[in-house]
Amino acid sequence: MSTVIHAGSRVLAPAADFLSPYDFFRDLTNPALAFLPRALLIAVVAALVCGSVGVHVVLRGMAFIGDAVAHSVFPGLAIAFVCGGSLVLGGALAGVVTAVLVALLAQNRRLKEDSVIGVLFVGAFALGVAIIARAPGYAGSLQDFLFGSITGIPASDVPVVMGGALFVLLMLFLAHRPIVAVTLDRESARAAGVHVLLADLSLYVAVALAVVISVQTIGNVLVLALLVTPAATARLLCDRLWTMMILSPALGASGGLVGLYLSWSLDVPTGATIVLVLTACFVLAWVFAPRHGVLARRLREKRG
């Protein structure tokens, strides 16, 4: 059902007709819709951070970790919800604890990272469901956790999200060299004196915090797309690492902006719309990328 809000002489009914960018800007500045600019800020910041972290996740071939961490933060979100605390802080605490456990357990080379992650995230998600089931009316809250809620972001979470985003970006900047070295060749990096455990821990914590920042806007189920799709698209469009690290967050932030605009105009779920926009960008890059697209490869094959 669409929500109709009267604002001055205009009736805001996003589902009634498609809003122009100008009307969307008016809605952003409408005091009666204070949640909308807040949601836009969180969506863009979350996409930017996930795009930055996702570069390392894609290069290391660890797409599964995003889904795993999204599930592993669920107990923290559930406890914070039941206790009436900050969902961002609760999820961040659970995510960091899980990141530390994964980093420590993954040092045992008899167990691959995906095995360790799979064991931990299933147990953590089950624990979160058990905890939130104790809360009255938990079904609606569970849906918000799984698929996001554009109206469910309190103003008190904005400074926490902004602080977390700055922390993640700073940590990625400071740990860039060791993380890349471990990604390219773990054993060579270890032999060169790189602290492999610290590099792994930095990446896992960055992923956990990026997921927590994103989960309220895009939801627990779809957060993997925000983490992987912009980076995968950038990977198709460029060859240099630094270019990829600039393009990926730019694509993510643009997808967050366009996705929120379309979801508000069409009255459809925000998280799903953002993911569809990013997926469309990936498909276009997969087909039309100048060097690595399908058409470019076919042309080279014909010329060869």
Which ranges hold each PLM region?
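Short loop segments and helix-boundary regions at transmembrane helix junctions
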Residues: 55-138, 234-248, 261-270, 290
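Helix-loop-helix "hairpin" substructures at the membrane interface of multi-pass membrane proteins
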Residues: 46, 157-230
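Loop-to-helix entry region at the N-terminal start of transmembrane alpha-helices
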Residues: 34-42, 142-169
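Cytosolic-side transmembrane-helix boundaries in multi-pass membrane proteins
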Residues: 3-14, 268-304
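Hydrophobic alpha-helical segments embedded in the membrane of multi-pass proteins
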Residues: 48, 70-74, 96, 122, ...
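Membrane-interface helix termini and inter-helical loops of multi-pass transporters
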Residues: 21-32, 137-153, 261-264
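Hydrophobic alpha-helical transmembrane segments
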Residues: 40-44, 88-93, 115-119, 158-163, ...
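Membrane-interfacial amphipathic/re-entrant helices at transmembrane-helix boundaries
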Residues: 1-47, 303
